[in-house]
């Protein structure tokens, strides 16, 4: 099946939000959004970060407990001699686990290479569709999606200056939404160093991971910065939900073009 794609034109904005020029986006930004592939690729990328865990092979077994036998009117579970306290069995206090987690368990969800490429391209295309961006809950007043800024944006080294730029391009409301979303996590995660959870805000895609904006923007709640060479579904569709509000620099668009255009015979 062949799909006829049409290129999209978007405006390049300066640091004050004024339009400088119009450029054509790479053709893959017009690709149909495949939610199923985005979800599969996200799960594959996410599970790669999981750490295998196991149990001590002797956990719950460091005891001399043996069953007292039958005809005593008590359960035949292993018991410690002298005290008669039940031990060792899975249904006893301090006993072994029946099926403990093992390090051999396969944690990574595998995905085909072509599906992975299509999933990333679909996630990129969703950032250029205002319907997906709004459906994800982002708040913005800009008419251009995705938002493309001049390369000078990568040299900003102060978070306050970045906030002024986000305000000029109509994205500052999304930062307010992120700040309002911060709350205490449900469950035991709050005992394990994950007490608070917070929403995802704008994603900034730059051409160089050593740019000053990488560190300065990390001080803004909900904002993530990633280079165009490393951007993946993890960044573009957190939780497997496509349509993250994304800000690109002009140079990063060219890097994405070299990375993806022509790889899938678009």
Curated annotation (Swiss-Prot):
Subunit structure: Part of the 50S ribosomal subunit.
Cellular component per GO, a single term: ribonucleoprotein complex
A Pfam family assignment: Ribosomal_L4
UniProt name for this protein: Large ribosomal subunit protein uL4
Family annotation (SUPFAM superfamilies): Ribosomal protein L4
MF (Gene Ontology): rRNA binding; structural constituent of ribosome
Coiled coil: none
Domain of life: Archaea
Family: Belongs to the universal ribosomal protein uL4 family.
Function in brief: One of the primary rRNA binding proteins, this protein initially binds near the 5'-end of the 23S rRNA. It is important during the early stages of 50S assembly. It makes multiple contacts with different domains of the 23S rRNA in the assembled 50S subunit and ribosome.
Gene Ontology BP annotations: translation
InterPro entries: Ribosomal_uL4, Ribosomal_uL4_dom_sf, Ribosomal_uL4_euk/arch, Ribosomall_uL4-arc
